[in-house]
Amino acid sequence: MAAVRVLVASRLAAASAFTSLSPGGRTPSQRAALHLSVPRPAARVALVLSGCGVYDGTEIHEASAILVHLSRGGAEVQIFAPDVPQMHVIDHTKGQPSEGESRNVLTESARIARGKITDLANLSAANHDAAIFPGGFGAAKNLSTFAVDGKDCKVNKEVERVLKEFHQAGKPIGLCCIAPVLAAKVLRGVEVTVGHEQEEGGKWPYAGTAEAIKALGAKHCVKEVVEAHVDQKNKVVTTPAFMCETALHYIHDGIGAMVRKVLELTGK
């Protein structure tokens, strides 16, 4: 009986040793080590706002959609805006200027940023992997004079500096809605989209912007609202957003396409 017990014990020990090994003779701890991966570093994205409200600042739905998609993509976001007066203040219930009222772009943008915002003068491309500009008339009124001067517009000096810094560093830039005119003005020859080039019965009410973009020396690429155009050479990604009169979820989807492409171009 003693001999039997010894034989059984030896076989159990052998079986235990066998089951503790995977093919190739690895223990469970060794197998686990093979599945460990180093977390990918988060892309650091600068979001540049132009106020708060579609007619005199940032289009709020666009800014929110960008933030949601950046969050889903695991990005670290820092929000910026220039510390300058707005061109004017619009009463959004009437769509008309509020006479005698003035507001600051940085202060108004802080509403969207929930107070966590930095002066655009402090934005350096060296500290970020990408920059994104939502639309809204603030891009054409506060970040530039496009709303008044069209193709002869001037771009805010800090906005121009930021666009050039990111471009020269080979870091991606995302712009949606009317904001692509900023890239068209500053980065000559860039490819952008603001959607279609004909109004098509009011579906594309700002289609004339495409001609102004061409007049600035940029290339306009026709895209649907759910699409994003990628200028691979310049690493500029654009989507029409509210340049199109359509359901909000389509605009959200197009912005998602833009954000995903921007994050892909960061390589993170």
UniProtKB/Swiss-Prot annotation:
Stored Gene3D superfamilies: 3.40.50.880
GO cellular component terms, A-Z: mitochondrion
Transit peptide: 1-41
Name of the protein: Glutamine amidotransferase-like class 1 domain-containing protein 3, mitochondrial
Subcellular location: Mitochondrion
Modified positions (N6-acetyllysine) in chain numbering: 151, 157, 164, 203, 219, 223, 233
Keywords: Acetylation, Mitochondrion, Transit peptide
Post-translational modification N6-succinyllysine, affected residues: 203, 223, 233
PANTHER family: ES1 PROTEIN HOMOLOG, MITOCHONDRIAL, GLUTAMINE AMIDOTRANSFERASE-LIKE CLASS 1 DOMAIN-CONTAINING PROTEIN 3, MITOCHONDRIAL-RELATED
Principal location listed in the UniProt entry: mitochondrion
Family named by the database record: Belongs to the GATD3 family.
